Amino acid sequence: MPKRPHVDGRRQFSDIPDGMETVERVVTDEKIAAFRASIANELVLAPLTKGGNLPFRRLCVDLGCNVTVSEMVFARYALKRNPVELARLRRHESEKTFGVQIATNQIAEGVNAGRLAFESGADFLDLNCGCPIHETWKRGLGAKLLKKPAKLERLVRGIADGVPLPLTVKI
């Protein structure tokens, strides 16, 4: 697959579905390098479904964790303003570096959820490609995405190009 075009170090918004506006803030290669440097050699709390809630993350920060990640957020429901999903986007002021993990199999959904995470104060976005829970599997989310590598590649590229945050992938 050809490399994404770069102009002045900025990522180009390609493969974004029609009707989606681009964001003013783009992720530059320098921003990605700075993000990587900021999490290098840091204690990172992995995203934990039904365990990585805000009180638990605060406890982990008190015990020395510097990078925290939300519980898995179903992108579709967050975009429908489901209060349970929106609560998972909350960040505490003690969280030095905070990421939001999303579950989606659609580029537009992932981009819009990423923008919501950005507006909520996240430092990075994490795409869940490792969850084996039946509920995610039957919806084509989580680990099920690994069954279709070409689709997964399009999804990752599309979300990475469309969100104003660095993107990580949990496998």
Each language-model region and where it sits:
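Active-site glycine- and acidic-residue-rich loops that bind
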Residues: 106-109, 166, 171
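Glycine-rich, proline-tolerant flexible connector loops at the mouths of alpha/beta enzymes
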Residues: 72-83, 129-149
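Alpha-helix-loop-beta-strand connector modules within alpha/beta enzyme cores
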Residues: 86-101, 142-169
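Short beta-strand segments
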Residues: 101, 126-130, 170
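Glycine-rich, positively charged N-terminal anion/phosphate-binding segment
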Residues: 17-33, 48-123
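Non-catalytic, substrate/partner-engaging modules appended to enzymatic cores
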Residues: 39-41, 58
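Mixed-charge, low-complexity intrinsically disordered regions
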Residues: 1-19
